[in-house]
From Swiss-Prot:
Positions of transmembrane segments: 386-408
Ranges per topology, Cytoplasmic: 409-431
Domain MANSC: 33-117
Positions of disulphide bridges: none
PANTHER family to which the protein is assigned, alphabetical: LOW-DENSITY LIPOPROTEIN RECEPTOR-RELATED PROTEIN 11, MANSC DOMAIN CONTAINING 1
GO annotation, cellular component aspect: membrane
Localization annotation: Membrane
Membrane topology: Single-pass type I membrane protein
Species lineage: Eukaryota, Metazoa, Chordata, Craniata, Vertebrata
One Pfam match: MANEC
Name of the protein in its database record: MANSC domain-containing protein 1
PROSITE patterns the UniProt entry points to: MANSC
């Protein structure tokens, strides 16, 4: 047991170190894609452009990484412009690395089959822009106040993944201290929480340097948003699929006591758990289960969501699972999920939650059912067409066999010739 725990701890440390190195390497590889253009070498030589000998790389990403790590062009110049030739095959040099003093020194001209990338080296490091996020203090949770943690979004080729693991049993006792404060926090407002998840629509690759996202602009007065750290995934991705907005009403108007400890649904990872207690909302996404206090990172996951809401004063939980939620796209584009929280004073039973989800799923259900009559009518038509073709083929085969048999029977039948036939035949022979 000891060796198994030690081995898993070592394996987790190795994975974290590997991802940290990949993250550190990817932060220096911010680039701007330029399709079907190439540097005008003749006019750029007099303006200070420098370059190395072309090399062979299997993919464009390898060429970009090679440019990011190359800092010895003409002695001490760092590569900031690269060209990848997609027309080269059979391990021929296809990656060209250059150093451009400025953008005006490297004029471009159109060229089919060549992809150019401008490496942005003066972009500020993302780790310095990410503020240290702490949970709100006890005095900031008074009525009329709210705390909010805003993390700036990187402007180019960055994918944000979800936080790894947040547990109520770890966060609440450490940050808020006593059960008296929990009672004061839960009894401040008996309102319902409405969660709006906005997903950013995918943009083209040329317009990916954009302004920062607007985050959480519909916050209530008595809401505490629990921030979570943001991990940066692999760079150089192209675009993100647009996601529809989803309304997740939580119409639970109860007052749990301070001694209740809500627990997350412990299913096999990966699991996404949304635990809602008025007036606070915690969104946590668990991918893998780490050993001790280490947080494990995962690559991709098919998410299952569980909604939990307190139902009585003793802290018992009602679990309403729902399986249809917008697919979270990880490390495939510029995706960031800003969360907006709004409070309302509408009280209803927990059964309204299931009704709202059924209503939300009704529109895609109707659209999918609209295609059923076409399939039902299309299948018999194809069936009759196949039967008709088969019948026509059999009929033509029978006709051909009849004609062939008639010809064969006539050729084998012995004819009776008359004297006139012999006379005519003799005349033709004489001629």
């Amino acid at each position: 047991m000891f060796f198994g725990g030690k081995g898993s701890l070592t394996y987790t440390l190795v994975i974290i170190c590997f991802l940290t190195l990949r993250l550190a390497a990817s932060q220096n590889c911010l680039n701007k894609s330029l399709e079907d253009v190439v540097i005008d070498i003749q006019s750029s030589l007099s303006k200070g452009i420098r370059g190395n000998e072309p090399i062979y790389t299997s993919t464009q990403e390898d060429c970009i990484n090679s440019c990011c790590s190359t800092k010895i062009i003409s002695g001490d110049k760092a590569c900031n412009f690269m060209i990848f030739d997609t027309r080269k095959i059979a391990r021929r040099p296809n990656c060209y690395l250059f150093f451009c003093p400025n953008e005006e020194a490297c004029p471009l001209k159109p060229a089919k089959g060549l992809r150019s990338y401008r490496i942005i080296r003066d972009f500020p490091s993302l780790t310095r822009n990410l503020p240290s996020q702490e949970l709100p203090q006890e005095d900031s949770l008074l009525p009329g106040q709210f705390s909010q943690a805003v993390t700036p979004l990187a402007r180019h080729h960055i994918v944000y993944s979800k936080p790894t693991d947040i547990s109520w049993r770890e966060t609440l006792p450490q940050k808020f201290g006593s059960s008296d404060h929990l009672e004061k926090l839960f009894n401040m407002d008996k309102a319902s929480a409405q969660l709006l998840v906005y997903k950013e629509k995918g943009h083209s690759q040329s317009s990916q340097i954009s302004s920062d996202q607007e985050i959480a602009h519909l916050l209530p007065e008595n809401v505490s948003v629990f921030p979570a750290t943001v991990a940066v995934a692999s760079p150089h991705t192209t675009s993100a699929t647009p996601k529809p907005a989803i309304r997740l009403p939580t119409n639970a108007s109860v007052t749990p006591s301070g001694t209740s400890q809500p627990q997350l649904a412990t299913t096999s990872p990966p699991v996404t758990t949304v635990t809602s207690q008025p007036p606070t909302t915690l969104i946590s996404t668990g991918f893998t289960r780490a050993v001790a206090t280490l947080q494990a990172m995962a690559t991709t996951a098919v998410l299952t969501t569980t909604f939990q809401a307190p139902t009585d004063l003793k802290g018992s939980l009602e679990t309403i699972p729902f399986t249809e939620i917008s697919n979270l796209t990880l490390n495939t584009g510029n995706v960031y999920n800003p969360t907006a929280l709004s409070m309302s004073n509408v009280k209803s039973s927990a059964t309204n939650k299931t009704a709202s989800w059924e209503g939300r799923e009704a529109s895609p259900g109707r659209s999918s059912q609209g295609n059923v009559p076409e399939n039902q009518y299309g299948l018999p038509f194809e069936k009759w067409l196949l039967i008709g073709s088969l019948l026509f083929g059999v009929l033509f085969l029978v006709i051909g066999l009849v004609l062939l048999g008639r010809i064969l029977s006539e050729s084998l039948r012995r004819k009776r010739y008359s004297r006139l036939d012999y006379l005519i035949n003799g005349i033709y022979v004489d001629i």
